[in-house]
């Protein structure tokens, strides 16, 4: 046991040094806006970062990681906060008769305050869950079912996360009416269309803050204002936005908000649901049990995970401006490097109303899966990790009007807190190299080079 704890302690110390070095690298790169000085330092940082894992095992040779929308690495400072509650402080936070329960309950309540502070809420409005998927299910199904005797209409969009869409389909099977609003070509909703869709039967509008595939940021403040004026509850899936962009549930008139721990450098298996108390939002719980979390989510709160989520929330609030500058710098660098070297590269989604850490590009005349296979030394994806097993083109890209060929050629680049200049440059250069190689093998690319408009060709069917 002592050897294990010794290895963990050594890893924590090593992680602290790594994180401090990363902060220095980010500061130098952001202030100078050049890669000259940070490039050498970031190489040293990367070597330190991937050399050991928590078990003190060597991990050299793993791919670079640019898939921050799927998940983020846990911040070492979050692990520091969690470790005592994985070892010494193991009491059940709901045990009110002894010190073991009291000390753990105190830690959970502190975490609740940290999450609430991040979004401008009251701690009593924070419900701990297993993640954003559960939070979305509770919010969408819970509100609809509670008010279902009088209101049977729910509004969402065609580009929501799959768990929201599937929750809405489940409600349709129960007899509810659901309107799936289309989005504009830039991925944003039409506010006038939303206003016209709300009726006296509408109980809930559920629209995500930042899209997990194309990074588009919806005007949640305007949506919230509209919903409040029409006395309709507004839920937003903010898993990709919390901790990355400023959010205030009161200023934005948000009634319910879903949060994920592992999207903000916290642990997996924990999330939160913000539920407004004034004006009060009523929910029907989707599971039965001991009535924990204000009776809305039964089950023992996992104290170590809750503590980790709280620590991640506090760090995100403290470093949000700093992280934004770093992510913007790297995202612009990646986009400029690729688009200046390759023609026919299309950015999917609005270029301004966006979170730059999620950059979705389509490379015309290249099959996206082929490009991903060629970039095997970089961890990337062609869309949501929750639907990555499907070979069908992204439903989000189809919803914004992207044709099937371009949808199949899309790659999502996820940039985060610990991404380095060297990683971005390496990825861009590899991407350019392989796109050029794959296009040389494409007869369609050859025809385009000869000036042939492919849209004018009548293709024969075989």
Swiss-Prot record:
Enzyme Commission number(s): 2.8.1.7
Which co-factor is required? pyridoxal 5'-phosphate
Any idea which positions bind pyridoxal 5'-phosphate? 132-133, 212, 240, 260-262, 300
Looking up SUPFAM superfamilies in the UniProt record yields: PLP-dependent transferases
Record GO terms (molecular function): cysteine desulfurase activity; iron-sulfur cluster binding; metal ion binding; pyridoxal phosphate binding; sulfur carrier activity
The record's account of tissue expression is:
Ubiquitous expression at high levels in any life stage.
Where does the record say this protein resides?
Mitochondrion; Nucleus
Q: What class of enzyme is it?
A: transferase
Q: Which InterPro entries match?
A: Aminotrans_V_dom, Aminotrans_V_PyrdxlP_BS, Cys_deSase_IscS, Cysteine_dSase, PyrdxlP-dep_Trfase, PyrdxlP-dep_Trfase_major, PyrdxlP-dep_Trfase_small
Q: Does the keyword Membrane apply?
A: no
Q: Where does [2Fe-2S] cluster bind?
A: 386
Q: Which residues cross the membrane?
A: none
Top-rank lineage group of the source organism: Eukaryota
Subunit annotation: Component of the mitochondrial core iron-sulfur cluster (ISC) assembly complex at least composed of the cystein desulfurase Nfs1, the scaffold protein IscU, the accessory protein bcn92/Isd11/Lyrm4, and probably fh/frataxin. Interacts with bcn92/Isd11/Lyrm4 and IscU.
Q: What does this protein do?
A: Catalyzes the removal of elemental sulfur from cysteine to produce alanine. It supplies the inorganic sulfur for iron-sulfur (Fe-S) clusters.
What's this protein's family per the entry? Belongs to the class-V pyridoxal-phosphate-dependent aminotransferase family. NifS/IscS subfamily.
- Its recorded name reads Cysteine desulfurase, mitochondrial
Query: Which lineage is the organism of this entry classified under, starting from the top rank?
Result: Eukaryota, Metazoa, Ecdysozoa, Arthropoda, Hexapoda
């Amino acid at each position: 046991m002592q050897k294990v704890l010794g290895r963990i302690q050594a890893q924590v110390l090593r992680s602290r040094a790594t994180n401090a070095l990363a902060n220095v690298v980010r500061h130098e790169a952001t202030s100078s806006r050049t890669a000259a000085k940070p490039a050498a330092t970031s190489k040293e940082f990367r070597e330190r970062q991937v050399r050991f894992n928590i078990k003190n095992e060597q991990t050299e040779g793993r791919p670079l990681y640019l898939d921050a929308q799927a998940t983020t690495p846990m911040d070492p400072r979050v692990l520091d906060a969690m470790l005592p509650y994985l070892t010494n402080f193991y009491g059940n936070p709901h045990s009110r008769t002894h010190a073991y329960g009291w000390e753990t309950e105190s830690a959970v309540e502190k975490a609740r305050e940290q999450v609430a502070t991040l979004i401008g809420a009251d701690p009593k409005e924070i419900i701990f869950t297993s993640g954003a998927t559960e939070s979305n299910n509770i919010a969408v199904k819970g509100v609809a079912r509670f008010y279902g005797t009088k209101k049977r209409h729910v509004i969402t969009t065609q580009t929501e996360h799959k768990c929201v869409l599937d929750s809405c389909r489940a409600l349709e099977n129960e007899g509810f009416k659901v309107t799936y609003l289309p989005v504009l070509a830039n991925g944003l909703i039409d506010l006038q269309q939303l206003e016209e869709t709300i009726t006296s039967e509408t109980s809930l509008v559920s629209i995500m803050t930042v899209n997990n595939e194309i990074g588009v940021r919806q005007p949640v403040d305007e949506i919230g204002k509209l919903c409040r004026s029409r006395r309709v509850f507004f839920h937003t899936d903010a898993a990709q936005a919390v901790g990355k962009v400023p959010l205030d549930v009161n200023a934005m008139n948000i009634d319910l908000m879903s949060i994920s721990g592992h999207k903000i450098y916290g642990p997996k298996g924990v999330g939160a649901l913000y539920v407004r108390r004034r004006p009060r939002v009523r929910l029907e719980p989707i599971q039965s049990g001991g009535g924990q979390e204000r009776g809305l989510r039964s089950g023992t709160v996992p104290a170590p995970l809750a503590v980790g989520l709280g620590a991640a929330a506090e760090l995100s609030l403290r470093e949000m401006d700093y992280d934004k500058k770093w992510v913007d710098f790297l995202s612009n660098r990646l986009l400029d490097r690729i688009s200046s070297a390759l023609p026919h590269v299309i950015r999917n989604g609005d270029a301004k109303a966006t979170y730059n850490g999620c950059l979705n590009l389509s490379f015309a005349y290249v099959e996206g899966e082929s490009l991903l296979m060629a970039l095997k030394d970089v961890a990337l994806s062609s869309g949501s990790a929750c639907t990555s097993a499907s070979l069908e083109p992204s439903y989000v890209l189809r919803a914004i009007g992207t044709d099937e060929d371009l949808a199949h050629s899309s790659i999502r680049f996820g940039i985060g807190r610990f991404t380095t200049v060297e990683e971005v440059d390496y990825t861009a250069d590899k991407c350019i190299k392989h796109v050029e190689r794959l296009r040389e093998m494409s007869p369609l690319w050859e025809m385009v080079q000869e000036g042939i408009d492919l849209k004018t060709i009548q293709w024969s069917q075989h």
